[in-house]
Amino acid sequence: MVPSRRTWNLGATPSLRGLWRVGRAPEPEPGMARPAPAPASPAARPFPHTGPGRLRTGRGKDTPVCGDEDSSARSAARPALAQCRALSVDWAGPGSPHGLYLTLQVEHLKEKLISQAQEVSRLRSELGGTDLEKHRDLLMVENERLRQEMRRCEAELQELRTKPAGPCPGCEHSQESAQLRDKLSQLQLEMAESKGMLSELNLEVQQKTDRLAEVELRLKDCLAEKAQEEERLSRRLRDSHETIASLRAQSPPVKYVIKTVEVESSKTKQALSESQARNQHLQEQVAMQRQVLKEMEQQLQSSHQLTARLRAQIAMYESELERAHGQMLEEMQSLEEDKNRAIEEAFARAQVEMKAVHENLAGVRTNLLTLQPALRTLTNDYNGLKRQVRGFPLLLQEALRSVKAEIGQAIEEVNSNNQELLRKYRRELQLRKKCHNELVRLKGNIRVIARVRPVTKEDGEGPEATNAVTFDADDDSIIHLLHKGKPVSFELDKVFSPQASQQDVFQEVQALVTSCIDGFNVCIFAYGQTGAGKTYTMEGTAENPGINQRALQLLFSEVQEKASDWEYTITVSAAEIYNEVLRDLLGKEPQEKLEIRLCPDGSGQLYVPGLTEFQVQSVDDINKVFEFGHTNRTTEFTNLNEHSSRSHALLIVTVRGVDCSTGLRTTGKLNLVDLAGSERVGKSGAEGSRLREAQHINKSLSALGDVIAALRSRQGHVPFRNSKLTYLLQDSLSGDSKTLMVVQVSPVEKNTSETLYSLKFAERVRSVELGPGLRRAELGSWSSQEHLEWEPACQTPQPSARAHSAPSSGTSSRPGSIRRKLQPSGKSRPLPV
């Protein structure tokens, strides 16, 4: 059976496959006209099946339509019309190129508005009246000063006017008139300068006005471009709305009523459901795009309002600027008129006063003519007095005696004043030296002090044993040497005479020694010819110890004072350089050769593997260590010195401290160096091994001179490795420590050449700048790579193992001796030198 049929125009209505192709059509390119979508077929409900694989149609396309059939066809065509409308506005959706283009245009307009607001803010800050107000205030102050000057001139003229006419010796009024004219010319010059400043201010105002006009022109161009862009976007928007309206106004293309359509394929049903879903998605996109267009219109309207406000503000700023400029010009013009009027009045008054002065001058001349008879009378009186003067010799002698007494008293007063001035000069000299020492400390210069030994019996007698060294009575940093009949002066940090004691010398270096406790590296070395007293200054005797023992005693006293807050450990090592061989003075085998190496931890410091290290707890321990070291040091007899040191001795004192409250660790090192004396082989009579020793000593001291010369000239390469001595002193001379040199000199005539060389070397060393010393301190606990083993105190301090590496920790000083043992499994840090 065939069901009742409804009419369907197969020539005008596309099939379902055609509708599917329309739904999947690609989007048109931006700027091109979008073709109108094809009308959709009715897809509101599935059609009844009539047979497999085909659609049944009823009447032909000319068959008339009944009433109920017409209403059914309309209801069935509504989904197709909705899909057609959705396709007509789909080109303006959020994902379409044209919608993206509109969004970009709106963002571009927003950026333009922001840049214009920034430009207006910049103009507002540039066109502020701060500079103009400052210039105006300066001009007002200048005009006020000129007014005060005019008032002062008027007061002087008034004083001249009120002064009674009388004799005018020396033309005083003429001089005052000349001064008034000079003041008048000065006021005119100041007025010209004020006019120049005014013209410069006007020029600056004109430049700012031109700049403002230029900025306004640029702003107007930007606003015009923005208006054109807005007009173009509005036009495009109107075209889009018109296109949408025209597409909506089109009548649906369905002209015939569907009669009967039956779907006989499951694939066709699926295509129909997909088409309906796409219809719904397109409708949502249209609603979303309409909302976006509405927001864009609101943003565009707000940008228009902001532009109008900015234009109004610019106009207001222009009016304020013009008003301020006008007020300033009026004020300046009025001030200039007042100034000109005051100058003219002062000039007129000065002319009147000049006339009065000339009249007074004429009266004075008349008075002079009348005084000539009186002058003749006075001449006669003078002749009479002259005759009387012949009887005044006795009176003159009496007067001379009184004058001599007064002169003697004046001389005594001058002498007392000179004594007071000399006392003040010496006080200022001491203050200058103190300031100079502080400057040297800040710069890091090597401080140099000189000590002159007394004349001894080894110097002999005769002309060669006379004293060739003198001192400045007012300045203790100046030393004078008489060399070959010519005096030579040297300036050092401090000069000690032969009468100076060991304590006096130690007081000069005491501050450096105490800085070792605070974590600084300190080096004190003695330099000079053989027999000049270096070993005596550094080591001294048992009754009168030198710097070495006094320094350690001072360290122990300082450690005891800080025992409540700090824990300190003091270790001592001693070495000598004999014939360019480094030997351990405290070891069991003093003849063993040691080497100087770099620390493997990358710190750049030097250390001596195998150097014996003693931990000392008291002064008795120090004395025992010194005695043990003295027995191993090399000394021999020469013609110049009975106990000549044939090696460079080095005493290394390491102070490690821990702050009990903060855990701060400090490590300070004190190097006390007793250099072997330079000598001339002809004088010392060295032969054999003594000659070889002298050659090595002179070679190492020459290398030290090369290092000082390189440091003084700030060369890039400093030859520290030319000798064991300079290599060992590298840390002390490379700017990481506080260094002091004690130069020992002989005062007798036969040693003036060596004394001259030593003092010249001292001056060169004094000019070397190493930089301020660095404090070695860090927070944290001591390294746990070593452990301490306590042993009871014994008669002789025991060495703390052969120092294959530097100790990394320490403990507080306690009774008894401490021996440091390295753990077999641990690797300790190398000992820095």
Curated annotation (Swiss-Prot):
Q: Keyword set for this entry?
A: ATP-binding, Cell junction, Coiled coil, Cytoplasm, Cytoplasmic vesicle, Cytoskeleton, Membrane, Microtubule, Motor protein, Nucleotide-binding, Phosphoprotein
Coiled coil location: 102-362, 395-432
What is the membrane topology noted in the UniProt record heading this document?
Answer: Peripheral membrane protein
Positions with biased composition (Polar residues): 806-815
Single GO term (MF):
identical protein binding
* List of residues that carry Phosphoserine: S813, S817
Q: Does the keyword ATP-binding apply?
A: yes
UniProt cross-references to SUPFAM superfamilies, sorted A to Z:
P-loop containing nucleoside triphosphate hydrolases
Q: Which PROSITE patterns match?
A: KINESIN_MOTOR_1, KINESIN_MOTOR_2
Q: Which residues are involved in binding ATP?
A: G528, Q529, T530, G531, A532, G533, K534, T535
Region (Disordered) residue spans = 19-74, 786-833
Q: What Gene Ontology cellular-component terms does the record carry?
A: centrosome; cytoplasmic vesicle membrane; extracellular exosome; Golgi apparatus; kinesin complex; microtubule; microtubule cytoskeleton; mitochondrion
Query: InterPro entries in the record, alphabetically?
Result: Kinesin-like_fam, Kinesin_motor_CS, Kinesin_motor_dom, Kinesin_motor_dom_sf, P-loop_NTPase
Name the source's superkingdom. Eukaryota
Segments forming domain Kinesin motor: 445-768
Indicate where this protein resides in the cell: Cell junction, Adherens junction; Cytoplasm, Cytoskeleton, Microtubule organizing center, Centrosome; Cytoplasmic vesicle membrane
Biological process (GO), any one: visual perception
Biased composition (Low complexity) is annotated at 30-48
- What is the protein's known function? Minus-end microtubule-dependent motor protein. Involved in apically targeted transport. Required for zonula adherens maintenance.
Q: Which family does it belong to?
A: Belongs to the TRAFAC class myosin-kinesin ATPase superfamily. Kinesin family.
Official protein name in the record:
Kinesin-like protein KIFC3
User: Which species does the entry assign this protein to?
Assistant: Homo sapiens (Human)
Taxonomy, top ranks, is: Eukaryota, Metazoa, Chordata, Craniata, Vertebrata
